[in-house]
Amino acid sequence: EHELSKFLSRLLKYKLVVGSTVLILMSDHGFGPFHKFIHVNNWLRQHGWLRLKQELKPRLKSAIFDMGFTPMGVYNLLMSFGLGYLKREVVRGRGQGLLKTLFLSFDDVDWSQTTAYSLGNVGQINLNVRGREPQGIVNPGPDYEKIRQDIIDRLQELRDPETGEHVIQEIYRREEIYWGDRLEQAADILFVPTRMEYFGFGEYEFGSNQILERMKRGISGTHRMNGTLVMHGTPVKPGVEVEDACLYDLAPTILHLMGEPIPSDMDGQVLTEALTAEYADPSQVRYVDSDKTAKERSVTQELSAEDESTLTERLRSLGYVA
């Protein structure tokens, strides 16, 4: 924050933002305190929506898991010796095979008896849908909707036993959030934890044997839904607080300020309330029909094996790919 303030001061002091140039400072999320992880797969297992295999090896792994031999237990031990950095090397690096050998994982799940599972962090639940998942058992239609509603109802009841407060603040069906031809790739249920002070654990399928787990060491804060937007320049109306701006309002606003037309299928809107009368005039906001053919071609164009490998490694180094 201090370095950012110094940078902005230099920009303004030396009048580097001149004429019609606009400085836009934005963050794609805010930040705040973090209290506990939610281990969603444990919660699903507790309610019978996720079941484990009954063969000897999964049963042994399950038994020692329930006794406390978990990835988070090992991580806390490493942290006590100052070796917490090794977690990134294992979880986000190339140690997934070792994790699956030592600890409970999706390899130990009985998919023929499992109706729901969780992947990713924050709050996402997928149903094990027939014809969509490799071993899906939930029939699309009424069966799917009933199970989804049952899970939503139970999520609304989840409370923190230490405080008694509800852990989940908002719950959505995927079609209430997403749209388009990639909707099938979204999780079936999405939820926002209370004040984002709880957080769905997403670095491993079964990170702990608890449902709610206080972080003993390591991170103390995490993301918030609301970010920051600051605009400065001649086209910007001073002293205005913009209400209900979204991330996807930035692109059409920037195109408009550059004097460029906005593609007709682009999400978001020009933030005219932040602009002076000259730039806020609706008649000056231009739109252009999107080139569907070029768009489809760019979406379907396949990467070479080398490019895909390079992209994957870059994403892995940032922690987005395991």
Q: Could you describe each region identified by the protein language model?
A:
Residues 1-5:
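A conserved hydrophobic secondary-structure block that centers on an alpha-helix together
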Residues 43, 150, 162-186, 242-245, ...:
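Polar, surface-exposed loop/tail segments
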Residues 194-251, 257:
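Low-complexity, glycine/alanine/valine/leucine- and proline-rich hydrophobic stretches
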Residues 304-322:
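Short acidic, low-complexity intrinsically disordered linear motifs used
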